[in-house]
């Protein structure tokens, strides 16, 4: 590849040198020196623009001598600068190469991915610590928000009622991480051994939440929840007595937050707490926006005046009166909407009471949370981008299984992002070791869910994979395909279930699949159409019709016509006794007698023998 690019640069250098010497180039000459795979008109225009920028004109055909003489002042004194030509050739070559590489989305993705440097073990730990710090700042902000404590206590109550698993509420303790690390480090497990186990179980497909998680000690959780509940009750009591800004209230609120941050909350619960705070902040901002609209758009109060006077007065119900007393030109209009503004302020006061915080505190808590989230998100992004190559290397092993390579990469990236969220650097393993499990889990699950035209449940995919693996082993062992009985014995499963699994495991095949060496016929041509009558049935029906007509010919014309009408032979439909009686102008009873007599004649062996062979014995 390097030699090819060097040769390309040499050709372009000669082209530029030629253009500098003669002062012009033709489109044909430029086209001859461009790569064959460069077909994008925009890229070609950019290249010609760069050539024009060097003072070389590009023409459809070579200009005549008179035109060259007219331009002699511009071209005759031009010197050929080899260095400039080399630099220009390198730039154009790079542009060409870039253009050729941007047509394939996989190449584009890999080129962009390759610009990010790989992380060392120390780099992984540094990013993991930044993620941890950001999440800690988020939880610290949530801890100061009283409704977060209320929600945590209510979720724990649901756990006590059996409606929540403990790990759906609390997954550990932040202040015991160091102790957990010391315990983990004493276990003699290496990254390689984990990877080996993963390789052996490559065909298994499980739930994304099947990752082994060791829950916290229930007794310890109960003890800490009890302490949190006690402190929170004390906070509510003091708040009701003194309000949000009293020193004792602030002190107890900090004590509640100190206990709150010791819990390592589950990701769904953390998201719920964050959403709760964001909704509250949005409500506060919504009321302020309405007041801003009323004051500036309706009353025409200058925006600067509003902002200056509104600050620290969001819940001051006297603010409107004070603004009106300033006797500005907008004061009368402000008086007309006084009740509306006061209503919005009262709603903000109600929010303060509901949250046990001032509006300023709510905004500050939100600012802390947003800052922590941004810090964690930035670090997660860096960790993900630095490990995209790992996803590529794993996804390559799962090609030709029903999903496109880009789809495999996408699913693997989703698993990588989950791994980043759940990674704990203190356990001593490299991130790549931990992420491999999540990436494979995401890819294998997506293959199980999406690869087949007819979806098969994931648990059945596991059984099919196990069956295929054992079948291959027995084929190598015995030199033949294993029978269902042998597979049932090997897998310790009922034989009928093995047969069902083998039937389900069949892959769909296209009806356009060529058949034979000439490939002039397709599989669909040999599939029986159940809606079309077979030739045997057609022949049988024709013979039956002829035989019935012959038998009826042996009866009297009246008897034959009665039977034809009663059974619809050679007619559109059959007829009732009354309908046949009207046709012959006789009673129903007479028609019944004629019919019975005719059938007795047909049952005679001389006539019935001809029809008996058509009876379907089966």
Swiss-Prot record:
GO-annotated molecular function: DNA binding; sigma factor activity
Region (Sigma-70 factor domain-4): 551-604
Region annotation (Sigma-70 factor domain-2) ranges: 383-453
DNA-binding span(s): 577-596
Family per similarity comment: Belongs to the sigma-70 factor family. RpoD/SigA subfamily.
Function summary: Sigma factors are initiation factors that promote the attachment of RNA polymerase to specific initiation sites and are then released. This sigma factor is the primary sigma factor during exponential growth.
Protein name: RNA polymerase sigma factor RpoD
Originating species: Xylella fastidiosa (strain 9a5c)
Lineage: Bacteria, Pseudomonadati, Pseudomonadota, Gammaproteobacteria, Lysobacterales
């Amino acid at each position: 590849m390097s030699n090819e690019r060097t040769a390309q640069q040499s050709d372009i250098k000669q082209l530029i040198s030629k253009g500098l010497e003669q002062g012009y180039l033709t489109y044909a000459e430029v086209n001859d020196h461009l790569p064959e795979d460069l077909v994008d008109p925009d890229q070609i225009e950019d290249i010609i623009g760069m050539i024009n920028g060097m003072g070389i004109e590009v023409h459809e055909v070579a200009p005549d001598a008179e035109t060259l003489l007219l331009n002699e002042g511009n071209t005759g004194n031009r010197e050929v600068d080899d260095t400039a030509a080399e630099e220009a050739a390198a730039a154009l070559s790079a542009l060409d190469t870039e253009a050729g590489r941007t047509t394939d989305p996989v190449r584009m993705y890999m080129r962009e991915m390759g610009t990010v440097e790989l992380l060392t073990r120390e780099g992984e730990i540094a990013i993991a610590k930044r993620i941890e710090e950001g999440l800690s700042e988020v939880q610290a902000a949530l801890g100061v928000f009283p409704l977060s404590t209320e929600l945590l206590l209510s979720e724990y109550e649901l756990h006590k009622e059996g409606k929540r698993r403990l790990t759906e509420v609390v997954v550990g303790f932040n202040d015991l991480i160091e102790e957990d690390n010391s315990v983990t480090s004493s276990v003699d497990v290496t990254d390689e051994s984990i990877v080996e186990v993963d390789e052996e179980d490559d065909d298994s497909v499980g739930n994304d939440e099947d990752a082994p998680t060791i829950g916290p000690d229930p007794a310890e959780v109960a003890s800490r929840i009890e302490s949190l509940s006690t402190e929170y009750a004390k906070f509510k009591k003091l708040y009701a007595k003194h309000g949000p800004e009293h020193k004792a209230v602030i002190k107890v609120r900090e004590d509640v937050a100190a206990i709150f941050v010791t819990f390592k909350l589950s990701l769904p619960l953390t998201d719920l707490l964050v959403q709760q705070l964001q909704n509250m902040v949005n409500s506060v901002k919504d009321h302020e926006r309405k007041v801003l609209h009323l004051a500036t758009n309706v009353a025409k109060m200058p925006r600067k005046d509003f902002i200056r006077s509104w600050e620290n007065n969001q819940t001051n119900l006297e603010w409107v009166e004070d603004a009106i007393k300033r006797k500005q030109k907008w004061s009368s209009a402000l008086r007309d909407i006084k009740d509306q503004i006061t209503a919005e302020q009262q709603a903000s006061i109600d929010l303060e009471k509901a949250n046990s915080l001032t509006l300023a505190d709510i905004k500050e808590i939100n600012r802390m949370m947003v800052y922590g989230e941004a810090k964690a998100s930035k670090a997660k992004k860096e960790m993900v981008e630095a490990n995209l190559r790992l996803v590529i290397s794993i996804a390559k092993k799962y090609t030709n299984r029903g999903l496109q390579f880009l789809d495999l990469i996408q699913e693997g990236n989703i698993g990588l992002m989950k791994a980043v969220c759940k990674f704990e650097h203190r356990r001593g393993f490299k991130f790549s070791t931990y992420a491999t499990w999540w990436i494979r889990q995401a890819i294998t699950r997506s293959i199980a869910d999406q690869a087949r035209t007819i979806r098969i449940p994931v648990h059945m995919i596991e059984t099919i994979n196990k069956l295929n693996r054992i079948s291959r082993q027995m084929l190598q062992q015995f030199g033949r395909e294993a029978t269902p009985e042998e597979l049932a014995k090997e897998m310790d499963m009922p034989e009928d279930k093995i047969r069902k699994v083998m039937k389900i495991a069949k892959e769909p095949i296209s009806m356009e699949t060529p058949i034979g060496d000439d490939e002039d016929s397709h599989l669909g041509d040999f599939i029986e159409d159940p809606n079309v009558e077979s030739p045997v049935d057609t022949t049988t029906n024709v013979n039956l019709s002829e035989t019935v007509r012959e038998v009826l010919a042996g009866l009297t014309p009246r008897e034959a016509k009665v039977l034809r009408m009663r059974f619809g032979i050679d007619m559109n439909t059959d007829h009732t006794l009354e309908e046949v009686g009207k046709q012959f102008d006789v009673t129903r009873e007479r028609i019944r007698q004629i019919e019975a007599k005719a059938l007795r004649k047909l049952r005679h062996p001389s006539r019935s023998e001809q029809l008996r062979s058509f009876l379907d014995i089966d």
